[in-house]
């Protein structure tokens, strides 16, 4: 029997057009799942679906900050398909200490990274319950447990994601719903390149090397490596695992001294 076989499963991946979310979507498809990608970029979304295959994936425009629209998207999916897997991957970053994090900064991070996850959970749980169960995977960060400099709002938001993971795992044990989270360190994606360019203009190469070295293993992670862990946690091989946050961090949280 093939391990990590998601044949017949329908997975929802938020933020699935690029980076980690896109790698997760591709990995799930390679392992026979059908993937519903939720994202904000319609043009990119259609391009992604063309590359994945319209018989293997579909794109749904969705702003995870808007609860009513999130519910509408999930209900439209659930009319024809079960939601077996939810990957809450959509998120944004923010640089700043508490004193230079504005109220608008905090509200924006909250709206996407916390309320966005809540909205998708809120829309999905009842669907999974009616279908006899499911698997939820939330994308957290090492920022939830390590004191990263200049990441006040972001760290707060990812700490909330880990807390939501534990609450959902506990509350829905009796409904056959598993819930875990992944906490990556720095993963090399186009988002990271853009983030460095925006915040460290003229110092891109220097900052990339500096950020890479913060992982004791000596490099940033690859989206495909996160996707492989996501595949395991969402597969039947992980049926005995719930309420756990998994660091994938090149030794960041345990080997940095």
Predicted regions and their residues:
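Residue(s) in the substrate-gating loop at a strand-loop-helix junction
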Residues: 141
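Active-site helix of classical SDR
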Residues: 121, 157, 165
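Short C-terminal tail/terminal secondary-structure segment
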Residues: 2, 146, 231, 242-257
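Active-site loop-to-helix junction immediately N-terminal to the catalytic Tyr of the SDR YXXXK motif
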Residues: 101, 147-155, 167, 195
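Conserved glycine-rich cofactor-binding loop
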Residues: 10, 17-18
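Alpha-helical segment proximal to the catalytic Tyr-Lys
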Residues: 126, 170-174, 239
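Substrate-binding pocket helix/loop in short-chain dehydrogenase/reductase
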Residues: 97-98, 102-110, 211
């Amino acid at each position: 029997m093939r391990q990590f076989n998601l044949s017949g499963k329908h997975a929802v991946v938020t933020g699935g057009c690029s980076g980690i979310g896109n790698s997760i979507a591709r990995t799930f498809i390679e392992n026979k799942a059908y993937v519903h990608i939720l994202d904000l970029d319609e043009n990119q979304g259609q391009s992604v679906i063309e590359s994945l295959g319209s018989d293997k994936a579909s794109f749904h425009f969705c702003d995870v900050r808007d609860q009513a629209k999130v519910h509408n998207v999930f209900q439209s999916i659930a009319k024809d398909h079960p939601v077996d897997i939810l990957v809450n991957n959509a998120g944004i970053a923010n640089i700043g200490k508490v004193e230079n994090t504005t109220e608008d900064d905090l509200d924006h991070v909250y709206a996407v990274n916390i309320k966005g996850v809540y909205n998708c959970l809120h829309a999905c749980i009842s669907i999974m319950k009616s279908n006899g169960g499911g698997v939820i995977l939330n994308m957290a960060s090492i920022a939830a447990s390590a004191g990263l400099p200049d990441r006040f709002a972001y760290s707060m938001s990812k700490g909330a994601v880990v807390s939501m993971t534990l609450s959902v795992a506990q509350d829905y044990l009796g409904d056959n719903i598993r819930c875990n989270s992944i906490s990556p360190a720095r993963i090399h994606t186009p988002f990271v390149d853009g983030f460095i360019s925006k915040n460290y203009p003229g110092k891109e190469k220097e900052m990339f090397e500096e950020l890479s070295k913060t992982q004791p293993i000596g490099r940033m992670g690859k989206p495909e490596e996160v996707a492989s862990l996501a595949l395991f946690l969402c597969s039947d091989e992980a049926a005995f695992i719930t309420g756990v946050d998994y660091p994938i961090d090149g030794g960041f949280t345990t080997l940095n001294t």
